[in-house]
Every structure is written in C-alpha cells, then in structure tokens.
Amino acid sequence: MRLRKFKKDEQAIELPINIVVMLVVGMVALAALLAIIPKSKENLSVDIIDVKVSDDPTIKGNTAKVVGAADHAVTVNIKVYDKNNNPVEKASATLTGGGGFGTDQTNKTGLAHLYLGGSSGSMVTIRPNQQSVELKLVVKANGFYDYEDERAVLLIQTRD
C-alpha cells in the first residue's frame, strides 16, 4: 500500500531537477572564472652590458671608477630577457641612486639605455668622503614579476 502511494506521489519530483540545473549553472560559472584568470607571471633576467661615467671610457660590467668628488653623468646599457632568453620588448627600466635617476623602455632586442644626467635625468653626486655609490635598478613589464636590484651598478671613487 505504501509503495503504491510513494510511486504516485509527485511532490518531490522538482528537487532533483533543481539540483541538476544548479549544478550545470555552477559548472558554467566556474568555467567562466577559470577562463578569466590570466596565466602565471614569469621572472625577468637583466644583464648590465656596460657603464660609462662622464667622459671616461665605457667599462663592461656593472662597476666603474669615478675620479674625484663631483656631479657625474652616468650611462648604463642593459638587456632584458624572459626565462627562455628571448628579449623582452617595452619593459620599463629605472635606475636611481646618488641623487640621480634615469628611465628608458626596452626596444625589440630588449636593450635599454639609461642616462643619469642632462635633460633626461639628474646627475649622480659623489661627495668628497664617499667611497662608493650604489645605483638601484627596477625593471617592470606586463606579464612578468618586477625585477629589482638594490646594488645593480657600483661607482667607486678614486683620487686620480
């Protein structure tokens, strides 16, 4: 008797259909959220090619000697790569320190020329009793973690 009554009872028929509909809508919403999430960021690699201080010759690497205490114009050439050693285009590079600053954007080959001094930035000041100045390099690009090196370039003061 109860089995027949249970078979004819249609009051709870909507419950499984509602659950199926909610499950489908939830899956569609989850798929949409996963499609919106951007791919993970990558690390940048930065090479400092050379450093030039005022009228002195260009020095390969990240260390240069400075003669005497004064304001100096500094030019630094860098190259920016991704994790596969491909050049990164349109990365913003900033070099600061010693009261000077310089900015540039990388070109198609990943090169940037940072000039501290003159019209595009202020000069680096080295005081009489100061032995060295460290310049901070920050590189930012879309889709990459920011690269930051507090001691990217070292300028060492010499007497002559």
Task: Show the residue positions of the predicted features.
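Short, aromatic- and glycine-rich surface loops/edge beta-strands on solvent-exposed regions
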Residues: 122-145
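Edge beta-strands of extracellular beta-sandwich domains
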Residues: 142-158
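Beta-strand-rich structural segments
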Residues: 61-85
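Proline/serine/threonine-rich low-complexity linkers at boundaries of modular beta-sandwich domains
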Residues: 37-56
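N-terminal leader/signal peptides at the extreme start of proteins
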Residues: 1-11
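Glycine-centered loop-to-beta-strand initiation motif
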Residues: 104-122
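N-terminal single-pass transmembrane signal-anchor helix
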Residues: 9-36
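Short amphipathic beta-strand segments in non-cytosolic proteins
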Residues: 71-73, 92-104
